[in-house]
Amino acid sequence: MLNYVIKRLLGLIPTLFIVSVLVFLFVHMLPGDPARLIAGPEADAQVIELVRQQLGLDQPLYHQFWHYISNAVQGDFGLSMVSRRPVADEIASRFMPTLWLTITSMVWAVIFGMAAGIIAAVWRNRWPDRLSMTIAVSGISFPAFALGMLLIQVFSVELGWLPTVGADSWQHYILSSLTLGAAVAAVMARFTRASFVDVLSEDYMRTARAKGVSETWVVLKHGLRNAMIPVVTMMGLQFGFLLGGSIVVEKVFNWPGLGRLLVDSVEMRDYPVIQAEILLFSLEFILINLVVDVLYAAINPAIRYK
């Protein structure tokens, strides 16, 4: 197992290098001139050229790439073109709000999604199954931005129960986490149901029932563990999606997180911030997939990596 983890970690190096090259090329292909955006609409050509020199955009592209890669290897992603603060500080100040929003959304989505999936599988083709899957399909189909605006209109504007924007208190997490986790809970419910339906028909489940084990214990002890492998895979993918893909929700709720920072950086063509954020998202996905693979062995001892 240790050798497998080490090999996967070493595999990060070429993957992140390829991502770095692609991201660098992508941001420099974006339309628009960062120097013109930063200088302002009334700046003349001389001022814009001065800003370009200050940002290093007047240098050849290969020189900019070498400067970017050599500094990134040392953990230095440069200064933000807009705020002139270190990129690491910009990301660090936005990381925790996104992380807590992701964890909050994931916790309720996993609990609700797995419960709905188990209920649907146990009472297959009956009204609990149909009700759970109808709710799940609705959760997948309803766009996140529309759900967020609906929740704000009902619970903030009409009823006045919850705040609309910001991340200052636990109350701010309620509507935003519900919006962000709705699709995840729906996907989790469908995956859990599909996995449980297959497990419930296995021989060891019938053997446990024949021995007089209660149905609840059969489902929770024998069924849940064996049905968890595909569910854990989906949990890992969805966690990575939430951590890096909460852009729409953060924009709707004016959330001070990484998603909103990325949108603002793209609008202002802030190359260093865009490059660092996408590298961070790539690293998150790779590490989450590694954790999921390691969890396989903990859930099912028959799985071993040699």
Swiss-Prot record:
GO terms for cellular component: plasma membrane. Residues 30-102, 156-168, 250-277 are periplasmic. The keyword Oxidoreductase does not apply. InterPro entries: BPD_transp_1_N (IPR045621), MetI-like (IPR000515), MetI-like_sf (IPR035906). The keyword DNA-binding does not apply. Residues 95-292 form the ABC transmembrane type-1 domain. Pfam families: BPD_transp_1, BPD_transp_1_N. SUPFAM superfamilies: MetI-like. GO terms for biological process: transmembrane transport. It is found in: Cell inner membrane. The chain crosses the membrane at residues 9-29, 103-123, 135-155, 169-189, 229-249, 278-298. It comes from the Bacteria. It is a multi-pass membrane protein. Gene3D superfamilies: MetI-like. Residues 1-8, 124-134, 190-228, 299-306 are cytoplasmic. Keywords: Cell inner membrane, Cell membrane, Membrane, Transmembrane, Transmembrane helix, Transport. Part of the ABC transporter complex GsiABCD involved in glutathione import. Probably responsible for the translocation of the substrate across the membrane. The complex is composed of two ATP-binding proteins (GsiA), two transmembrane proteins (GsiC and GsiD) and a solute-binding protein (GsiB). PANTHER family: DIPEPTIDE TRANSPORT SYSTEM PERMEASE PROTEIN DPPB-RELATED (PTHR43163), GLUTATHIONE TRANSPORT SYSTEM PERMEASE PROTEIN GSIC (PTHR43163:SF5). Belongs to the binding-protein-dependent transport system permease family. This is Glutathione transport system permease protein GsiC. It comes from Shigella boydii serotype 4 (strain Sb227). The lineage of its organism: Bacteria, Pseudomonadati, Pseudomonadota, Gammaproteobacteria, Enterobacterales.
